[in-house]
Amino acid sequence: GNDYHLPDYSRASGLHVIDFTMHHNFETMSNAWNVACPENDKYYNDATWNVVYVDSHDYAPNGAPEDKRYSKPQANWAENLSLMFTYRGIPCLYYSSEIEFKKGCTIDKGPNMPLRESGRAYFGGYLKGDIQGVDFAHYTSASGNVGQTWSHPFAQHIRRLAAIRMAVPALRKGQYSRTGCSGSCCFKRRYTDATTDSYALVTISGNATFAGILNGQYVDCV
């Protein structure tokens, strides 16, 4: 539950995978959470290298529906993002999902639909303007269209999640466990190396109780 072990990379192929298992089930966070269980990690040398995403230029999750850009309520999107940035794998965001661009639009119909009406429409205009960055996921000012883009609640949610993930090594590289975790979606993650011992307790959209945790001082990252 709390221990980290170094994966046997000598047995790795060097090719990591897109996490289709989670993608297909991201209609809701709970669906993805239930299917991405520790018992399935035996199929991967190191599941922290899986590329995890909700929607793409081809498909949304099953039932979302698949042929349209993700159209579920904002609360669903926010939960999906929270799980993506804290659970196994590397989060991958499809361009413009941070503002729900073309939400619910058909993703692609080839020559039978103008590109501007599809989910693959041009997004560059939303990035016009100036932004002054000071550090990873932090900026002091943003003007023009990009300023409006950055002000979207999802863009800010992603920015905060990225900053939290960067600050906590366990959320990037740690193995996870559900042992001693009581709640709808909660887990422990730990990562150790010669200079690092990072440990995190995570719950998504709900209360949780953790048992058998490591001694020490716990700090709220959110």
Model-inferred region functions:
Residues 17, 34-35, 44-216:
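Loop/helix patches that line or flank the sugar-binding groove of alpha-linked glycan CAZymes
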Residues 1-24, 102-112:
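Substrate-binding cleft/loops of secretory-pathway carbohydrate-active enzymes
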Residues 1, 26-30, 163-165:
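Generic hydrophobic, helix-prone segments enriched in Leu/Val/Ile
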Residues 6, 17-42:
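Core domains of carbohydrate- and sulfate-ester-processing enzymes
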Residues 11-13, 31, 210:
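Residue-level detector of intrinsically disordered, flexible termini
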